[in-house]
Amino acid sequence: MSVDKSKALVLWLDEVTIEDIPIAGGKNASLGEMIRNLSPLGVKIPYGYVVTANAYYYFLDYNNLRDKIRKILEGLNTDDLKDLQRRGHEVRELIRGGTFPPDLEEAIKDYYNKLSEKYKTHAVDVAVRSSATAEDLPDASFAGQQETYLNVVGAENVLVAIKNCFASLFTDRAIVYRERFGFDHFKVGIAVGVQKMVRSDMGASGVMFTLDTETGFKDVVVINAAYGLGELLVRGEVTPDEYIVFKPTLMKGYSAIIEKKLGRKDRKMIYGTGDERVKIVNVPKEDQKKFALNDDEILQLAKWGVLIEEHYSKKNGRWTPMDIEWAKDGILNELFVVQARPETVHSRKKENVVKIYKIKTPEEERKNRVIVKGIAVGDKIATGKARVLFDLKEADQFQEGEILVTDITDPDWEPVMKKAAAIVTNRGGRTSHAAIVARELGIPAVVGTGNATEKIKTGEEITVSCAEGETGYVYEGKIDYEVEEINLENIPKPKTKIMMNIGNPESAFRYASLPNDGVGLAREEFIIANYIKIHPLALLHYEDLKELYEKLERENLIDEKGFVQFKLIYHYANGRLANKLAKGKDKLRVNLRKILQDIENLTFGYEDKATYYIKKLSYGIAKIAAAFYPNPVIVRFSDFKSNEYANLIGGILFEPEEENPMLGWRGASRYYSDVFKEAFGMECKAIIRVRNKMGLTNTKVMIPFCRTPEEGEKVLQVMEEYGLRKGENGLEVYVMAELPSNIVLADRYAQIFDGFSIGSNDLTQLTLGLDRDSELVAHLYDERNEAVKRLIAQLIKTAKEYGRKVGICGQAPSDFPEFAQFLVEQGIDSISLNPDSVLKTMLAVVEMEKKLGVLK
């Protein structure tokens, strides 16, 4: 029997579709749409019913409330806060005091009883959610505060919750909004969804977006997860785990998780007892250090996210990224989707215009001016006077263009946020209220700083920067920056491939929107120093170090702070460890206790120390490879010098003190040495994970500082020992051309490797025999020197003769567009640049190609 939906008071969720927003509200219409279309594809959605907007109006008229409400609100001055609060309270109490028409009450109870039967219980636990139905409001988020009542059990309690939802249409904020914009209070309806609760109080919950929310990058699903019911995450009171899944290889069947970050999940909301429907409890310490979801669950959610996005994109006739709420039932151990709505910020963006915020103040100077740091929202920068607010009661002090600094925000803060140049909060994550609103307003926000309200004072000038990757910084005073706006439609594409040098995986999604042909140099060093932080040999020999520490402690050879003399470390180390320790450091004192504690803290939750290194490195590489997929991404194996490796945790134990590290134990010579070989093996395993497990076969590798062809052959042999074979599954191996020997013997290197990448920085130093860090000779350092240019021209010629690819990843073409033109003249295949010089160099290359007749 077909239902006349336009008059219905109550409908099952699968009776409504997205076209029914006027009677069912956006949330319920979306649930109905998914149950009808996506449940058959395996997406699990809890069942329920909708008390329609017709029922709301019927309730108002049955209780003669329209005139009474109009009367209460007559002559309201919305600037008089006390008067507003008094009248708002009166309206809400009036609605709560109303009675349901008997037929409506009976229908609501009848549907509740049938829902209980469906779930084989006499009184099913439900979530009761309001959903405003105003179609003509320009910003429906202000139509009514969306109330949610969780763990409602029993028909009578459902009726009370529905009444509370009706009353939520008249929160003070909603009244102000409609009064200010001249909307009729009764043109805005409300529908209420009654949906089976998912027992996420015993499991986990969160949100997922089918794009990267900060950059609008389309090819990922970003999932946030926390323990318990979802309210704390939405309110920003816990920092959730974050998982990123790459869509193109996920849909080919790969385990495409390209990033996992552990959140600070110290509290959770669970079911309460008696009158207390829900309560907040602490999460046990061991659970805080675990991920809320396992890999299979992450992949399952991501696949559902893609299915939901595909459905809505098809329905709307355009790409429609989605914002989806999910929950994991801890009793059933099953995942469910509980809500989905289109993501509104990036889907409306102009795709061809890129704005790039560039900081001009030097990094050294900025470092000393950091007040607090947290999670960056967006990629902009703002400067202004800080206004620290602890309470909304102080909101009237807030001036247009100030920077809002507060503990946490909720929807009641939105009128203040709309006036802010930027937002800084103590608490909250990427999906907290402050982050969502900042994105919608297009202003930078730094959330989850921990202590901004203590560190920042009202009236002081500060700069909020979200233009430095995933970490947002708040600086003292004004930081110098510029904004470049580029219309990509106006950029002609050269024949020479234009690639990028990327070190920080956090900036990869942002830079991928620039015109490019891939990444000519992806550096591992940033990932190792910032993600991993621990020397690879300290991880591989952790158990040996622990055993050594216990031995030394038994002998009372460690002081109260944890220090021990290096010569004692040599003396007591077992054979395995002793062979790897640095020599000649007898007199040095080392804090062995701190090294072990730091390693233990960073690697907690990983099955073993080597896995920590391999996974962390693979996530960093994968993020870059995914951002530029399917274009090639050339990953240079680690090229730290011994003094740089020594700065890593535990590095002091294993790294020699060299007079000239730049010419010492670095690059290829490390990879096959008995001391370092096993550490290099972990790098190989990380690449295998990225290519074979995640499906990112656009990843290629490059050997730095390879002094002789024989060294090159030895490295390829070690790679094979660890399962990474040149040519297997299309793997290409390049060599850095940064030593004169690489160019003099280019014909021999060409028979070993698939291609060359010119490292013009070291090549210039080694050709001219100078140290560019020495101010006495630095004035002679110039990549445009005739000797350097002749070597480069010779290499390009040899590479062409042997059918090998040749590119450049050094600094020169980024700094000097005329140098890029010289490379084009020589017939180079690709030029890899720093992201901030891609566009100007591209124009210089196009100009030269036109001159040479390569480009018409």
Curated annotation (Swiss-Prot):
Report the GO molecular function annotations. ATP binding; metal ion binding; pyruvate, water dikinase activity
Q: Which GO terms describe its biological process?
A: gluconeogenesis
Q: Which PROSITE patterns match?
A: PEP_ENZYMES_2, PEP_ENZYMES_PHOS_SITE
Which pathway? Carbohydrate biosynthesis; gluconeogenesis
EC top class, in one word?
Answer: transferase
Catalytically driven reaction(s): pyruvate + ATP + H2O = phosphoenolpyruvate + AMP + phosphate + 2 H(+)
**Similarity-based family:** Belongs to the PEP-utilizing enzyme family.
Q: Which PANTHER family match?
A: PHOSPHOENOLPYRUVATE SYNTHASE
What is the recorded function of this protein according to its Swiss-Prot or TrEMBL entry? Catalyzes the phosphorylation of pyruvate to phosphoenolpyruvate.
Record protein name field: Phosphoenolpyruvate synthase
Protein species of origin: Aquifex aeolicus (strain VF5)
Q: What is the lineage of its organism?
A: Bacteria, Pseudomonadati, Aquificota, Aquificia, Aquificales
